[in-house]
Curated annotation (Swiss-Prot):
SUPFAM superfamilies: YbjQ-like. InterPro entries: UPF0145_dom_sf, UPF0145_YbjQ-like. Belongs to the UPF0145 family. This is UPF0145 protein APL_0465. Pfam families: YbjQ_1 (PF01906).
Length: 106
């Protein structure tokens, strides 16, 4: 399945629009990771633990998006965007949402 941020796919024609599809993942970090990430922030480095968690959540959201697109009979998703938002206050929770338009291409 082709998943792209662009509204069209070079070399393919969109023959049918199936509608909006979403992939949503809510994730949280644990106390130990939070502690070491805060130390990293103080000394000015990058938090590999958080980056890894965010990357995993992004991949899961895209997998959910693809699953939903297949469910509605699409073979591609165009116009994909990703949103990241913290939630749960100081509990270290965040949500990653992938949104796009499911289409049939040939």
């Amino acid at each position: 399945m082709i998943i792209t941020t662009t509204p069209t796919i070079d070399g393919h024609q969109i023959t049918e629009y199936k509608g909006l599809v979403f992939g949503e993942v809510v994730s949280g970090a644990n106390f130990i990771r939070d502690f070491f990430a805060s130390i990293t922030d103080v000394i000015g480095g990058r938090s590999g633990a958080y980056e890894s968690k965010l990357n995993s959540a992004r991949q899961e959201a895209l997998a959910e998006l693809e699953k939903e697109a297949k469910r509605v009979g699409a073979n591609a998703v165009v116009g994909v965007s990703m949103e990241y938002q913290s939630m749960g206050g100081d509990k270290g929770m965040f949500i990653v949402v992938a949104t796009g338009t499911a289409v049939v291409i040939r």
